[in-house]
Amino acid sequence: MYILHIEHPVPSFEGWKKAFDSDPVGREKMGVRHYKILRPTDNPNYVMINLEFNTEQEAEALLAAMKVVWGRVEGTIMTNPKSQIVEVVETKDY
């Protein structure tokens, strides 16, 4: 399993969430199996998103699509996106 981790500041969480929910790249069609949106408890205007994929290639394809979207919206609903694709090596639930 692979996770595309994205994080960035947002001027308004509500405005960003509306744009996220519009799903401009078609997350499910691009292979996203599951996602989580996280926010630091001390900063509601910063978001982290973990998108889970079966393959690294799916994660890379979504990241490429997001870079196009970011080029259109950076400075309006978000700024300075950082991203990384990671492989899940081990998980355990307690």
Predicted regions and their residues:
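Glycine-rich beta-strand-turn "strand-cap" elements at beta-sheet edges
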Residues: 2, 30-48, 71-94
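Short, well-ordered beta-strand segments in beta-rich or mixed alpha/beta enzyme
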Residues: 2-9, 36-65
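Residues that cap or initiate secondary-structure elements
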Residues: 12-14, 55-57, 89
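Short amphipathic alpha-helical segments
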Residues: 12-35, 67-71
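Amphipathic alpha-helical interaction segments
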Residues: 21-24, 28, 43, 54, ...
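Extended interaction regions within the primary functional domain
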Residues: 62, 68, 85
